[in-house]
Amino acid sequence: MIKHSWIHLYVMASAMSSSPIFFFFQRWSLTLSLRLECSSAIIKPTAASNSCVQVNLPPSMCDYRHEPLCLAFL
C-alpha cells in the first residue's frame, strides 16, 4: 500500500512539474516505510522475559527523533 501511494504521488508530482512537492512526498513516504520496517522487527515479549520490548534492529535504525536519510538521489 505504501509503494502504491508513493508511485501515485510521484506521477502526480511529475505531472505538475513541481520538484519541492515531489521531495516532500518522497520524504514522507520514506518515513512511513521505515516506520513499518521497524515496527515489524519488534518481537512480542514472552512471559519469561523481564524486558518490555525486544528489538532485532539497533536503536539507531528506529530512532524517530531525526529524519531518515534520503538515499534516492545520492
UniProtKB/Swiss-Prot annotation:
Protein name in UniProt: Putative uncharacterized protein GAFA-1
Any one cellular-component term (Gene Ontology): membrane
Membrane topology reported for the UniProt record: Single-pass membrane protein
Subcellular location: Membrane
Main location: membrane
Transmembrane portions of the chain: 7-26
Keywords: Membrane, Transmembrane, Transmembrane helix
Gene (UniProt): GAFA1
